[in-house]
Amino acid sequence: MTVQPTTIGIVGARGHTGAELIKLIAAHPQLQLVFVSSRELAGQRVAEHSDGYEGELRYESLDADAVAAKAADVVILALPNGKAEPFVAAIDANRPQTLLIDLSADYRFDPAWYYGLPELTRHTYAGQRRISNPGCYATAMQLAITPLREQLAGPPQCFGVSGYSGAGTTPSDKNNPALLADNLMPYALTNHMHEREVSAQLGVPVEFMPHVAPHFRGITMTVNLWLQQPLTREQIHARYLERYAHEPLIEIVDEAPWVSRIAGTQGVQIGGFTMAPGNKRVVVVATLDNLLKGAATQAMQNLNLALGWDELTAIG
């Protein structure tokens, strides 16, 4: 008996994350990509823009009703913030059974949506068909802070540096290589959306200062944590090892991880664990690829989880 593949479509596929999603879907034995929506690339063959895809599918320019009419089993929205609502409304009205995964910030504060950071939230998944993917910076911050969450004596201070792919493909200062050359560009130094996201998810205030760097992909998150009681470096290291012992995408390392080593890989490295005198302050460093674990890989984990498959299918 032949098992029918699960059909999937992507809305907003021109961006860097869309390209990574196409590669992961092409590698998935149980998924069939049935539409890819992009106004800018409409009419062009997907295979010309994605190394991993070999079919004849072409990009289409689809509005919300047209996406709903495709009746795909799964739809991933890879749109800029603020653009998801019409597509969600159309799918809610016409295909409520569709599994919908939104990569924007639009539904991360909506309690009706499952917030999908599997290493921290998979135990709360209860069959929701609406999944909000966490932000890239927010993923790094939460994974770096959580093992010491109950020991915090004050707000974590998080200094984040991202490659310019995190600024998307729409031209701006933050993804202009000429402006970024020999430069580090701070922005949104208070009240960044990922600061609010992490504060809400962890239930503690978090202070976040993002920066864009000249490299293309990868995030370095340096987190300063004040502790209620002194802990040794060995105790802290052991807490992280224990918390993530069964998480194959999270590697605890001794030295501070380098972003150059994580770019293009699916997981997260956490390390550095440097104590201040008195052992009530520790600095932890996390690195991840913003396009993969910060976006596409995490979406695939959430998809696999929701459909009852091995969480790492197509991820490796």
Swiss-Prot record:
Catalytic activity entry: N-acetyl-L-glutamate 5-semialdehyde + phosphate + NADP(+) = N-acetyl-L-glutamyl 5-phosphate + NADPH + H(+)
Subcellular location per the Swiss-Prot or TrEMBL entry: Cytoplasm
Associated pathway: Amino-acid biosynthesis; L-arginine biosynthesis; N(2)-acetyl-L-ornithine from L-glutamate: step 3/4
GO cellular component, one term: cytoplasm
InterPro entries per record: AGPR_AS, AGPR_type-1, NAD(P)-bd_dom_sf, NAGSA_dehydrogenase, Semialdehyde_DH_NAD-bd
EC number: 1.2.1.38
GO biological process: L-arginine biosynthetic process
Assigned keywords, A-Z: Amino-acid biosynthesis, Arginine biosynthesis, Cytoplasm, NADP, Oxidoreductase
Keyword Cytoplasm set for record: yes
Protein role: Catalyzes the NADPH-dependent reduction of N-acetyl-5-glutamyl phosphate to yield N-acetyl-L-glutamate 5-semialdehyde.
Protein name per Swiss-Prot or TrEMBL: N-acetyl-gamma-glutamyl-phosphate reductase
Organism: Xanthomonas campestris pv. campestris (strain 8004)
Taxon lineage: Bacteria, Pseudomonadati, Pseudomonadota, Gammaproteobacteria, Lysobacterales
